[in-house]
Amino acid sequence: LSMFDFDTVLFPLNWALGINRGWGDRISETVKEKGIGLLGMKALVRRNWREGEARPYPKSWCQPIWGDEALGVAAMKYAVLKGAHTLVPPGNFEHFSFMLDHADACYTKALTDEEWAMLRREAKEAEKELIF
């Protein structure tokens, strides 16, 4: 970002990576300082697939959050808190629809203490199976 004058940046703003490794902290600060748009992807990713695990989304190389509305909303709010102006949904219609259905809440309501606690708990469980 110091070499070119970008208007936007596409970056994986994943809550488990952020909580466990501080992933995304530097880019989040930089885009805020420079007034650059931030497109957040991988917000709805839980962890890597486990070997032999059933994969209902065969084109996905990582396990999406599905069936846990509270975690999905908290994960989206985390990405917005990090500075995402736009969230890029996963590639299937169900997840795309989930993001559309919950976008307003993510941009108008802050993460609650309960949501933070849930994200930290889930991040601890995913610690050894992070996507990067």
List the predicted regions and their residue ranges.
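Beta/alpha (TIM)-barrel catalytic core signal, keyed to glycine-rich beta->alpha loops juxtaposed to Asp/Glu
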Residues: L1-F132
